[in-house]
Amino acid sequence: MSCYSPCQTAACGPAPLANSCNEPCVLRCADSSVAIQPPPVVVTLPGPILSSFPQSTAVGSTASAAVGSSLSAGSVPIGAGGSLGLGGFGWSGLGRGLCGTLGRGNLLC
């Protein structure tokens, strides 16, 4: 039986910080012939069709995970809900300025 794989195993796009690719792959193998006796009869059986769903995942980082490090993708900052990844410390913003609560609900910008 002869089979070949027409499916590509290369990455499915550019190498971003995190990427996941899941594309189906179908492999068709050659037909088989069988001789059944007696009396001699030739029957052609269809070849198997093999299906798979390969997955490739790439995860990376461009900055340290320390608090205060700026992580960005294409000059757009990304973090944990706030600018510079300080969303859990009462700071908010879109990376263009820092605003946060100071003391009894006073807003510091």
UniProtKB/Swiss-Prot annotation:
A GO cellular-component term linked to this record: intermediate filament
Pfam families registered for this protein in UniProt: Keratin (PF02422)
N-acetylserine: modified positions: S2
Single GO MF annotation: structural constituent of cytoskeleton
Coiled coil: none
Disulfides per UniProt: none
InterPro entries noted in UniProt: Keratin (IPR003461)
Keywords: Acetylation, Keratin
Family of the protein in this entry: Belongs to the avian keratin family.
The protein, known as: Beta-keratin-related protein
Organism: Gallus gallus
